[in-house]
Amino acid sequence: MKVSLFVTCLIDLFYTNVGKATVELLERLGCEIDFPEAQTCCGQPAYNSGYIKDAKEAMKQMMRAFADADYVVTPSGSCAAMLKEYPHIFRGDPEWEEEAKRLAAKTYELTQFLVNVLRVEDVGASLPGRATYHTSCHMTRLLGEKEVPLRLLEHVKGLELVPLPNAHQCCGFGGTFSVKMGPISEQMVDEKIEHIEEVKADYLIGADCGCLMNIGGRIGRVGKPIRVMHIAEVLNHRN
């Protein structure tokens, strides 16, 4: 099965290990990985900031880059959700509406692709320790996904998975929200860390690098001994 990988801006710039883990995991499961070099930002930051014209140019480039893809897989619920918004954004556009529909239909967040397309829940991962999972807003509210990541994590050997109190509460990142509403964002992420400490987790796992950057950055600043990992890194981990 040929898979075209959309790496996202945060992975490309800050979390290259997540991209590497995604490739290794998919290849181990028998996928042939293609990386369209013409891919760019999905347009979400510009779109959410009101720069619609600029955002649409990025979106058009994404549609060109992945035009020949069979499956588009990304280790990001947020960016996958944005690609699935393209049909709404380009509704009524005679040139781009159908392209937007095609890209949206073949786009999958990584864990959804593993479970719903490859039909795999146990990927052979192992990671000893106690972990809790942060559910990102876009993963649940836009993609409507709550259970698939947990089903995969439940099969990781040696990993004790404990529920996170108020798991569906925003971590305070919210893209530009954390910039525009800094003090509020800081209080939100502090509350999130309190809940992580409450369950005595060794690991905080998530599926969106924006959340992990926000939570992990704050954990580092306050000096808490909690390791932050993307779910792709966990699923690719072998002892």
Swiss-Prot record:
Molecular-function annotations in GO: oxidoreductase activity
InterPro entries assigned: Cys_rich_dom, LutA
Coiled coil: none
GO terms, biological process: lactate metabolic process
Classification via Pfam families: CCG (PF02754)
GO cellular component, one term: cytosol
Function description: Is involved in L-lactate degradation and allows cells to grow with lactate as the sole carbon source.
Entry's family note: Belongs to the LutA/YkgE family.
HAMAP family for this protein: LutA (MF_02105)
Protein name from the UniProt record: Lactate utilization protein A
Organism: Geobacillus thermodenitrificans (strain NG80-2)
